[in-house]
């Protein structure tokens, strides 16, 4: 039975009208004077730290920790500014699905498994009032690889449970093939939602346990069995 539910953020819980991508571009422009840093870059399912390294290397720059520190400080400032003016929201069905999970006889714990850096995740979810709904998370600060972030999330969940969590006691919810892959990396069950850039059929090709248009389309009890 599922004891821990790990949620992706962008494209799964919320949409921000590309606030994060815009903030990335503005930060690269301000810190490194790259004028088209995010053009033709795929963000879906990727990690902030991995993307930053990729973009810097594409511009002939091998990043240092100081580079990351300067970049992400600027990115977070831009993110807060942009979120305040671009709108966005929580996807339909998210609140009801989480409420349904909380109402189950054996209520699972909620965590985050995301490619955002921790402070970026906090800014985004606080903006929509749901940061407090998650006990803990694993983030791009922990590793550049999403599969490794999943392992961190499993370890932190186990620590909170006071015992090792088996993979099949964990449910990973995400909107990209990379979310499915990272769930499989820890032996978790995977619920793929087509609220991001991929259709239900595209997600099904990667063989999640469930693939739905939105979290409104699946009873919470079904995924906890």
Describe the predicted segments one by one:
Residues 16, 20, 90, 143-149:
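Phosphate/oxyanion-binding active-site loops and adjacent basic polyanion-contact surfaces
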Residues 49-63, 153-155:
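Helix-loop "lid/cap" segments that line or gate small-molecule binding pockets
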Residues 40-45, 114, 141-142:
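Active-site nucleophile and cofactor-binding loops and adjacent substrate-binding regions
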Residues 6, 80-112, 118, 134:
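Short, acidic loop-to-helix structural element flanking the phosphoryl-transfer center
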Residues 1-3, 63-66, 95, 99-102, ...:
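Asp-based, Mg2+/Mn2+-dependent phosphohydrolase catalytic module
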């Amino acid at each position: 039975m599922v004891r821990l539910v790990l949620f992706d953020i962008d494209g799964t819980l919320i949409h921000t009208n590309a606030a994060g991508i815009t903030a990335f571009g503005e930060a690269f422009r301000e810190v490194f004077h790259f004028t088209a840093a995010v053009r033709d870059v795929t963000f879906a399912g990727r990690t902030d730290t991995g993307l930053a390294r990729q973009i810097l290397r594409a511009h002939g720059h091998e990043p240092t920790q100081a580079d990351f520190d300067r970049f992400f400080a600027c990115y977070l400032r831009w993110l807060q500014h942009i979120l305040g003016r671009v709108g966005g929201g929580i996807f339909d069905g998210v609140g009801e699905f989480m409420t349904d999970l909380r109402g189950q006889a054996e209520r699972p714990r909620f965590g985050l498994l995301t490619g955002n850096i921790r402070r970026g995740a906090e800014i985004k979810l606080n903006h929509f009032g749901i940061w407090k709904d998650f006990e803990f998370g694993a983030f791009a600060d922990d590793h550049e690889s999403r599969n490794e972030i999943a392992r961190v999330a499993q370890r932190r969940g186990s620590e909170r449970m006071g015992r090792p969590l088996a993979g099949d006691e964990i449910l990973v919810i995400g909107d990209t093939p990379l979310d499915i892959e990272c769930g499989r990396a820890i032996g978790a069950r995977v619920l793929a939602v087509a609220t991001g850039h991929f259709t239900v059929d595209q997600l099904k090709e990667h063989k999640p346990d469930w693939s739905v248009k939105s979290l409104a389309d699946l009873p919470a009890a079904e995924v906890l069995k």
